[in-house]
Amino acid sequence: MVVKIGIIKCGNIGMSPLIDLALDERADRTNIDVISIGSGAKMGPNQVVEVTTKMVEDIKPDFIIYVGPNPAAPGPAKAREILSASDIPSVIIGDAPGIKAKDKMAEEGLGYILIKCDPMIGARRQFLDPVEMAMFNADVIRVLAGTGAARVVQNAIDDIVEAIEAGNEIELPKIVVTDAKSVAAAEFSNPYAKAKAMAAFAMAEQVANIDVKGCFMTKEMEKYIPIVASAHEMIRTAAKLVDEARELEKATDSVSRKPHGADGKRLNKTKLMEKPE
């Protein structure tokens, strides 16, 4: 059986460019097909309704992943409404602001994965250009991968695929991705590596708070520019910490790797020169 996964991307969080690739990292899985559509950087109601309706009515996958910022915002709320009314199992992947809507999403029959270390960008025109945007997102992706947060997401989606393949009832995830869940999924062997990853996670959480202050709570340009710049410096440092954590694991040949087999089976290895099983 080939499970058809539909991914809707509206706006952008760090997990957005990663989600479809993390499910088929070598592009050789025979048990899934992934179709991604999106509305680019915008996530207004009109853009979101257009792409979500297309996914539900035209593409009709076995299950849907909606990924983007703040699932409680007006645009994503429209997507939730459409997905809830459909008979297609759906999961919302979002950032920390979505936590306030998690009970509502559960009432709507939707799964959710809300990632606390996937922070808002410093979206001030005087500071943010395409280069800065790209570098920020690159740092966020390193934090998601290096702390284990991305693996939490991957495991939850793989669970859905396996349930569909087996013909079992789908249990949609209801997960708030915390530092504890992330580092547990990362399976660090070195306690110092784990500590560095926890520190990186905490820093990424604070980046979101600082960028909210700089983007929405501060009106004077001479004040908000250094505020958002400081947040970007912080995520850069967090990315360096996860690099340091991985180097510690590499030094003892104990990096946890969990590739997918061609049949979609989740494999496992730690030693560099051994085969995954």
Curated annotation (Swiss-Prot):
Reactions it catalyzes: 5,10-methylenetetrahydromethanopterin + oxidized coenzyme F420-(gamma-L-Glu)(n) + 2 H(+) = 5,10-methenyl-5,6,7,8-tetrahydromethanopterin + reduced coenzyme F420-(gamma-L-Glu)(n)
Pfam families in alphabetical order: MTD
InterPro entries (UniProt xref): MTD (IPR002844), MTD_sf (IPR036080)
SUPFAM superfamilies xref list: F420-dependent methylenetetrahydromethanopterin dehydrogenase (MTD)
Principal EC category: oxidoreductase
Pathway membership: One-carbon metabolism; methanogenesis from CO(2); 5,10-methylene-5,6,7,8-tetrahydromethanopterin from 5,10-methenyl-5,6,7,8-tetrahydromethanopterin (coenzyme F420 route): step 1/1
Keyword Acetylation attributed: no
Domain of life, per lineage: Archaea
Region: Disordered, residue numbers: 249-277
GO BP, sorted A to Z: methanogenesis, from carbon dioxide; one-carbon metabolic process
EC number: 1.5.98.1
Record keyword Oxidoreductase present: yes
UniProt keyword annotations, A-Z: Methanogenesis, One-carbon metabolism, Oxidoreductase
Single annotated GO MF: ferredoxin hydrogenase activity
Protein role: Catalyzes the reversible reduction of methenyl-H(4)MPT(+) to methylene-H(4)MPT.
Family: Belongs to the MTD family.
Protein name, per record: F420-dependent methylenetetrahydromethanopterin dehydrogenase
Record lineage: Archaea, Methanobacteriati, Methanobacteriota, Methanomada group, Methanococci
